[in-house]
UniProtKB/Swiss-Prot annotation:
This is Hydroxypyruvate/pyruvate aldolase Bphyt_0320. It catalyses: D-glyceraldehyde + 3-hydroxypyruvate = 2-dehydro-D-gluconate; D-glyceraldehyde + pyruvate = 2-dehydro-3-deoxy-L-galactonate; 2-dehydro-3-deoxy-D-gluconate = D-glyceraldehyde + pyruvate. GO terms for molecular function: 2-dehydro-3-deoxy-D-gluconate aldolase activity; 2-dehydro-3-deoxyglucarate aldolase activity; metal ion binding. GO terms for cellular component: cytoplasm. The keyword Lyase applies. Belongs to the HpcH/HpaI aldolase family. The record marks 89 as: Increases basicity of active site His. It comes from Paraburkholderia phytofirmans (strain DSM 17436 / LMG 22146 / PsJN) (Burkholderia phytofirmans). Pfam families: HpcH_HpaI. The keyword Magnesium applies.
Length: 260
């Protein structure tokens, strides 16, 4: 089988913006269909969506079945070693960790994605050969190549994380800082108001920290206008809302138009 590679990890180092979509429906059919939409990446959400490790595996298969460039990302609900291991064994190559608040937490997230090896003796990932990620044992170089190909994205979504953001960004193995705008706004005392000046200043600080560390900054955008604003502000890894949001917007608009 071909060598295990992660094109998204290398693309995160480039300057061109990468636009993605949140998959919240828990549907492998939706995941496969949306792989045809042309997004750079599709995020399978385990934190706020009804996805367990089996659902994630089904959606990873569905996206792969499209044979198109959309790269799957999986957001795990927490830094639990057993869960991270299952998601990686299922074939995920890029993981997002929520609410990282210190360099130590960021370093732990990275360790969870790494096999113990000469370059990462503190890696915490358990070794299993006959898993989907390794072609069920047919991709024999997987264990040797996986460490260098797994991408780690950490979310900054609290006042505490913001205060440590420069140290988090400088953590070896972190590929991207991703802003959780709703939670960040709430943590800064502005629940429901991510447009507040304090929140905007926090976002600018996160972009600056990422730039200084030579990594990407990402964010969730509610609509096209917001996505363009974030792009112009220096964000390079941008989620253009979620599948369920676009489904409701389009169907409601169509119904309103036909009834008018």
């Amino acid at each position: 089988m071909s060598t295990f590679t992660n094109p998204l990890k290398s693309r995160l180092k480039e300057t061109d913006p990468l636009f993605g979509l949140w998959l919240s429906l828990g549907s492998d059919a939706a995941a496969e269909a949306l792989a045809h939409a042309g997004y750079d990446w599709l995020l399978i959400d385990m934190e706020h969506s009804p996805n367990d490790s089996g659902d994630v595996t089904s959606q990873l298969r569905a996206i792969a079945a499209a044979h198109l460039p959309s790269e799957p990302v999986v957001r795990v609900p927490s830094s639990e070693a057993w869960l991270v291991k299952r998601v990686l064994d299922a074939g995920a190559r890029t993981l997002m960790f929520p609410n990282i608040e210190s360099a130590d937490e960021a370093a732990r997230a990275v360790r969870l994605t790494q096999y113990p090896s000469a370059g990462a003796l503190d890696g915490e990932r358990g070794v299993a050969g006959a898993v989907r990620a390794a072609g069920y044992g047919m991709r024999r170089d997987y264990v040797q190549t996986a460490n260098a190909q797994i991408a780690t994205i950490v979310q900054i979504e609290s006042a505490r994380g913001l205060q440590e953001v420069e140290k988090i960004a400088a953590t070896p193995g972190v590929d991207c800082l991703f802003v959780g705008p709703a939670d960040l706004a709430a943590s800064l005392g502005h629940l429901g108001d991510s447009k507040h000046a304090d929140v905007q200043a926090a976002m600018a600080r996160i972009v600056s920290a990422a730039d200084k560390a030579g990594i990407a900054a990402g964010i969730f955008a509610m609509d096209v206008a917001s996505a363009k604003q974030h792009r112009d502000a220096g964000f390079r890894f941008i989620a253009l809302a979620a599948d369920v949001m676009w489904m409701l917007r389009a169907t409601r608009q169509a119904l309103q138009e036909v009834r008018s």
